[in-house]
């Protein structure tokens, strides 16, 4: 009941009805019964991931993937001969997340390792991202998806953006203006990459993340406690 007026309330009951044939309202009194019923059905072959996709006549599945993801399961699925296409979607949000310098540096270091590109400046990071962008294209990617709180369109110069990268990569916090400039620059960079390959660019706009402070401390970020920003 605490999800009422949140899309999760409708989505949850829609899935229970259409996928599992369950009409009950999910609440503390029915949770165990529904949980057990769903798990019993999930043991059946027709309720496996592939079974469900076949049941709903799915032709293509597009996942959401970070630039540093290996896409190994996309490759394995394709090589297995599975008749439904599984394609990656480029979701580079963490490359724009400069609010916490330590987290940003850790991400850039992972990007450098995965791309095999030494990163010490802004241009290096863009080169590494472009290499991963090429890899995603090789695996059939045709879409990008960007989770943003607003459409960033702050004026900036290349000199400013390079200095901002050096500052945050060096561990110094940024001002609000610097954050907006950096995010604006990255949206342009990603837009150019997508345009060059003819990809469709999508914006997951206005979602408020990590609303539940208790669960954020327990589980970490992006674990399902989002809502629509209004």
Q: What residues fall within each predicted segment?
A:
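Metal-cofactor-binding active-site regions of metalloenzymes
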Residues: 1-197
């Amino acid at each position: 009941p605490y999800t009422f007026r949140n899309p999760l309330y409708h989505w949850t009951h829609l899935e229970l009805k259409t996928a599992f044939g369950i009409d009950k309202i999910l609440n503390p009194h029915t949770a165990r019964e529904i949980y057990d019923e769903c798990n019993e059905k999930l043991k059946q072959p027709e309720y496996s991931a592939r079974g469900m996709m076949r049941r709903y006549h799915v032709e293509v599945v597009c996942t959401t993937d970070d630039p540093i993801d290996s896409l190994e399961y996309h490759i394995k699925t394709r090589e297995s001969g599975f008749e439904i296409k599984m394609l990656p979607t480029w979701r580079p949000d963490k490359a724009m997340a400069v609010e916490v310098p330590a987290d940003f540096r850790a991400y850039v270091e992972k990007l450098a390792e995965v791309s095999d590109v030494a990163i010490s400046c802004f241009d290096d990071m863009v080169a590494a991202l472009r290499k991963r962008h090429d890899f995603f294209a090789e695996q059939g990617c045709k879409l990008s998806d960007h989770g943003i709180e607003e459409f960033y369109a702050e004026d900036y110069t290349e000199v400013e953006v390079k200095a901002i990268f050096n500052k945050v990569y060096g561990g110094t916090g940024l001002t609000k203006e610097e954050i907006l400039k950096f995010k604006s620059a990255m949206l342009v960079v990603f837009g150019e990459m997508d345009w060059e390959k003819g990809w469709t660019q999508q914006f997951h706009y206005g979602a408020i993340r990590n609303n539940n402070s208790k669960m954020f401390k327990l589980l970490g970020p992006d674990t399902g406690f989002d809502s629509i920003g209004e």
